[in-house]
């Protein structure tokens, strides 16, 4: 039965927003419009992943979590810690906005895209993932979707865990959350992860010297947070985390030159906030600072040698957001300010550079009878390209009880990164990349099956491409993306099923050729059940045909990469109420495949872990 009520009573529509690991319709999400609202009131397709899901899947990386979600296509240059890209609904990797606790991820290397192979899985307590345009709420990058990684724990207690696996993988983690009196709580975490890895064998991409070494990964992480409730309505927090990573990879070798095949990444982030949570009005002020230093060097000479490269960026942000309950919905408004500072040499930028952006936005949500309306508008003032406006609107109609039709349209954009603007081949006159998106969807609850099917189109213009003749970047590319997405979840006795299907036709609108590294079709299936206190899980993923470039010879040739079916098997057993042991086999049938041409994947891998809570 569908309940209709205002946001004052936290309305929920049980049949809607089907595909989510946390399937409760009353689940609150914060990413859609920056304040908590029931997931069922978000018209855009939204997925929520909890820490319990991550533990059940026994994921050892953020990429392993995201690859299971609808519309997501992950490519990686090998195994743990190797360079990776996220494609959502066929858009570029730079068209995905990644937030950490609602704050934009600091992008070392000013590449303009997030490499989540470096972000520690130990910090991830929850993931909220929204598909479709969201620039009208968040500004640049939110063309394909938004991934918000939340580090705040929900429950107090202490957990000690350890794990071991293939390729000499080992992981040790301890975390605790404790109450200090009635109004204060503190959270601490420390994590160590290491793997010897394997030889990713970047065939043809390493120049004249073969590199038959293991490409390992090491990560050390610290996290701390202090939260305090001043009154029932006022609260504040201070939070900080940092990680120190080292990655070995196969680099391009030129005779007589150092071999830069080691990456060292230092990253730290700090934020503090003050929140007011009244019955009708909510407000929050958050400030943050992050600093990343990304070295690539030859270990024979060290990271401070003149042959090494350093990408260094500092990011400062201030967010002021407000939300007011109005009728059967709400109105929100806020201001974002951001400053990014680079050092000379970062991203091949000869001089250090500051870029500032101020955004003002307005959001609205209202329920009128059988209809739900959502809209947002934003204007950004950027120190490089000036002003840019975006907007989006959606409407949902419950035409039969338990069934809803949704139509939406939105504009979004991607600002040029600093390397494209001021690098050796840069062009300071670049404009933002622009997107116009349409989507129509049906969703409902039929015979216990919670389902959604949608079709979408995304036209992207002013794409920034490199011109081989002028050796400069220009706004000259166009893309046309059409897709269909279907999701469902249901129970059959003790079995829980979650399934999704994606069809994406992503093409260069000028040449009508497929965009590289995007699978045309994907099928994802998760089966979970409990038998004699054992928790079992089977994951299936089909990756369809994709295209890539062979960079081993010039001119570069386009190559076709066939599809593959992958299976994972995971099991967990609670030895006591405090101690749980887990085991997993990834790539159960040891399939040989690549997501980036020339870079091998790991093959079959085993992990064994245990956790003790008190």
Swiss-Prot record:
CDD domains: ligand_gated_channel (cd01347). Cyanocob(III)alamin binds at residues 83, 85, 92, 110-111, 251, 309, 517, 551. A motif (TonB box) lies at residues 26-33. GO terms for biological process: monoatomic ion transport. It is found in: Cell outer membrane. Residues 1-20 form the signal peptide. SUPFAM superfamilies: Porins. PROSITE patterns: TONB_DEPENDENT_REC_1, TONB_DEPENDENT_REC_2, TONB_DEPENDENT_REC_3. One of its GO terms (cellular component) is cell outer membrane. Keywords: Calcium, Cell outer membrane, Ion transport, Membrane, Metal-binding, Porin, Signal, TonB box, Transmembrane, Transmembrane beta strand, Transport. InterPro entries: B12_transptr_BtuB, Plug_dom, Plug_dom_sf, TonB-dep_rcpt-like, TonB-dep_rcpt_b-brl, TonB_box_CS, TonB_rcpt_b-brl_sf, TonB_rcpt_CS. Ca(2+) 2 binds at residues 213, 215, 249-250, 261. The chain crosses the membrane at residues 158-165, 169-178, 184-195, 217-227, 232-248, 263-277, 279-296, 309-325, 328-337, 353-369, 371-381, 385-400, 403-417, 434-443, 449-458, 473-490, 494-509, 517-529, 535-550, 558-572, 585-596, 602-614. Residues 155-614 form the TBDR beta-barrel domain. Residues 38-152 form the TBDR plug domain. It is a multi-pass membrane protein. It holds the Pfam family TonB_dep_Rec_b-barrel. GO terms for molecular function: ABC-type vitamin B12 transporter activity; metal ion binding; porin activity. The keyword Calcium applies. Ca(2+) 1 binds at residues 199, 211, 213, 215, 250. HAMAP family: BtuB. Belongs to the TonB-dependent receptor family. BtuB (TC 1.B.14.3.1) subfamily. PANTHER family: COLICIN I RECEPTOR-RELATED (PTHR30069:SF53), TONB-DEPENDENT OUTER MEMBRANE RECEPTOR (PTHR30069). Involved in the active translocation of vitamin B12 (cyanocobalamin) across the outer membrane to the periplasmic space. It derives its energy for transport by interacting with the trans-periplasmic membrane protein TonB. This is Vitamin B12 transporter BtuB. It comes from Escherichia coli O139:H28 (strain E24377A / ETEC). The lineage of its organism: Bacteria, Pseudomonadati, Pseudomonadota, Gammaproteobacteria, Enterobacterales. The gene is btuB.
